[in-house]
Swiss-Prot record:
The lineage of its organism: Bacteria, Pseudomonadati, Myxococcota, Myxococcia, Myxococcales. The keyword Cytoplasm does not apply. It comes from Anaeromyxobacter dehalogenans (strain 2CP-1 / ATCC BAA-258). Transmembrane segments: none annotated. Signal peptide: none annotated. This is V-type ATP synthase beta chain. Keywords: ATP synthesis, Hydrogen ion transport, Ion transport, Transport. Pfam families: ATP-synt_ab, ATP-synt_ab_N, ATP-synt_VA_C. One of its GO terms (biological process) is proton motive force-driven plasma membrane ATP synthesis. Produces ATP from ADP in the presence of a proton gradient across the membrane. The V-type beta chain is a regulatory subunit. One of its GO terms (molecular function) is ATP binding. Belongs to the ATPase alpha/beta chains family. InterPro entries: ATP-synt_VA_C, ATPase_a/bsu_AS, ATPase_F1/V1/A1_a/bsu_N, ATPase_F1/V1/A1_a/bsu_nucl-bd, P-loop_NTPase, V-ATPase_su_B/beta. The gene is atpB. The keyword Transcription does not apply.
Amino acid sequence: MDLVTRRIRGALGIAGPLLFLEGVPRARLGEVVRIRGEPEANGRAAEERSGQVIALSRDRIAVQVLEETRGLAPARAEVTLTGQVARLGVSRGMLGRVLDGLGRPADGLPPPVPEARPAIHGAALNVTRREKPSDFIETGVSAIDGMNTLVRGQKLPVFSCAGLPASRLAAQIVCQARVRGGEAFAVVFAAMGSPFREYHAFLEAFRAAGVLARTVVFLNRAEDPPIERLMTPRCALTCAEHLAFVHGLHVLVVLTDVTSYCEALREVALAREEVPGRRGYPGYMYTDLATIFERAGRVRGRPGSLTQLPVLTMPDDDLTHPIPDLTGYITEGQIVLSRDLDRRGVYPPIDVLPSLSRLMGLGAGPGKTRDDHRPVADQLYAFYARGRDVRRMAAIVGAASLGEEEKRLLAFADAFEDELVGQGGTFRTIEDTLEAGWRLLSGFPPAALTRIPERLLRARSARPAAGAAAVSGGAVA
């Protein structure tokens, strides 16, 4: 036993997943602990459990046990404090693997051979070394690519409501996402608090689409301890940082569901007997979420990038709830799913009006996607917003009372939702999306297209067949 390792026999007691000790010298918050019970009746050594120090007082500590505490006798427990914080062995060999929430193999294969073992809490990127996010990540989803473009190095959350197909959308993005130009690309997917049916659906979707080879999957199940849920996104990001900044890959990290993470954060905070903040969540939840989201970005002089797409469920459909509220302050926009669109059978039910990508200008337009990307998106936004206003007015006065222009806008809003947003499970390139936008705009006279420069309208008029191009795409399982 080295100088930093301390071994203690006997604990004060156990309460649920918590183990309480006293008289522990030099204990540190977040320190990794190993726990072993008394030998079994047949003489076989007891199974070793692991844990983490989550609370310190003057003479006592609380340890969150990562496995079950059933059958563990406090008086006979042997506890070893390792003096180490949680670390993860990372390597490029993690691609194609399915791991549990702590990075241990969950696919029956041996652990990947590590190239390094960094601490999972990571280190903040030096602000003077941060590169501005730029370039386009194609998700294959028109409402994102065309209207709220995702940029390499960005953190763009998806705000969902209970019962909406956020998990299906997350799986679809994992299956479809790519970078243009043939650069190396990978996806790190982390599910937090997923029930059995959901995480098996994720795996089946990834295997059916043939994308598992370029994906690292971290699965934290609903029955796993809350402290593991707090470590899962950090393990995923530690892996992603290694792939991005050591191997030069462009990495998209999809985290779902951040609400499950925050519930676990609240549960652990209550176990520590901390003073609760808004709605029972700890007052430091903003800082804690920032330690996750701020790990996205690009580093000057390094070829890779780390982009985040966290998915969260808004409790009670409340956009002002602490979880989406604080997330919105840290991230760079939001993709909002609509219960009304879902009720009408539109998938994905993305409401583009409250949705926003603040960095869209860095990844869309000349040299990034297409010259007409921003003008077409702006014009679609303008007509759709007016069409939504007309729809509300028609609900009061009746559609028969509308003028010709209002009827045209109302028809546009319906077609926009059904044809552009409601693409189903198909993959669309950015060219497919923009051609679909032009096709919708073709129902208006050129004089009404005030957001599109004259030179683009003239160039478009020289391509009469392009405006009638059909929306294409391949089905994604």
